[in-house]
């Protein structure tokens, strides 16, 4: 059984709204989770990290004011410390985050969303 697409979003985020509109327009089912009210668990974050190609840099919002205010050197932190930080301060996560059983899309990226759409379409027609 295929895991449904999970869409971590924040309603006032422009990229999240664009992504949600795109998903609906392409009739892709998803389970939306408010990133700050339903923060990803440690296990979910580990899974998201396992799908990245660039590790933490791919999901960390380094340009955010929250990140800048912390004045941290992520490179010196352990994975567990980073996970705890992301759970405590989910604003440090880039958004939106879309994840299913084998695919991860970060941000509004129509090209990547299209790949996700094609994968879903192929699966549904089989």
UniProtKB/Swiss-Prot annotation:
Annotated Gene Ontology cellular component terms: cytoplasm
Effect of gene knockout: Deletion of the gene results in differential expression of approximately 70 genes in response to ethanol stress compared with the wild-type strain.
Cystines in this chain: 13-16
SUPFAM superfamilies assigned to the protein according to its UniProt record, in alphabetical order: Thioredoxin-like (SSF52833)
Stated consequence of mutating residue 63 to E: Slight increase in MgsR stability. Strong decrease in activity
Outcome recorded upon mutating residue 55 to R: Loss of activity. Strongly diminishes expression of mgsR and of the MgsR regulon
Localization: Cytoplasm
Outcome, altering residue 42 to E: Destabilizes MgsR approximately by half. No change in activity
Pfam families hit by this protein: ArsC
Keywords: Activator, Cytoplasm, Disulfide bond, Redox-active center, Repressor, Stress response, Transcription, Transcription regulation
Statement: the UniProt record of this protein carries the keyword Repressor: yes
Notes on how activity is controlled: Activity is controlled at multiple levels. Regulation includes a positive autoregulatory loop on mgsR transcription and a post-translational redox-sensitive activation step by an intramolecular disulfide bond formation in response to ethanol stress. In addition, protein stability is strictly controlled by rapid proteolytic degradation by the ClpXP and ClpCP proteases. The McsB protein-arginine kinase might serve as a proteolytic adapter for the ClpX ATPase in the degradation mechanism of MgsR.
Induction remark: Expression is sigma B-dependent. Induced by ethanol, heat and salt stress. Positively autoregulated.
Function statement: Regulates transcription of a subregulon within the general stress response. Exerts positive and negative effects in response to ethanol stress.
PANTHER family tied to this protein: ARSENATE REDUCTASE (PTHR30041), GLOBAL TRANSCRIPTIONAL REGULATOR SPX (PTHR30041:SF7)
Entry similarity comment: Belongs to the ArsC family.
Protein name stated in the entry: Regulatory protein MgsR
Gene: mgsR
């Amino acid at each position: 059984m295929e895991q449904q697409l999970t869409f971590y979003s924040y309603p006032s985020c422009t990229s999240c709204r664009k992504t949600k509109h795109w998903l609906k327009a392409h009739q892709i089912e998803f389970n939306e989770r408010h990133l700050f009210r339903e923060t990803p668990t440690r296990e979910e974050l580990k899974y998201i990290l396992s799908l990245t190609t660039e590790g933490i840099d791919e999901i960390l919002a380094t340009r955010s004011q929250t990140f800048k205010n912390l004045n941290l050197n992520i490179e010196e932190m352990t994975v567990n410390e980073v996970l705890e930080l992301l759970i405590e301060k989910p604003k440090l996560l880039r958004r939106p985050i879309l994840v299913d059983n084998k695919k991860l899309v970060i941000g509004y990226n129509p090209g990547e969303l299209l790949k996700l759409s094609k994968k879903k379409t192929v699966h549904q027609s089989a």
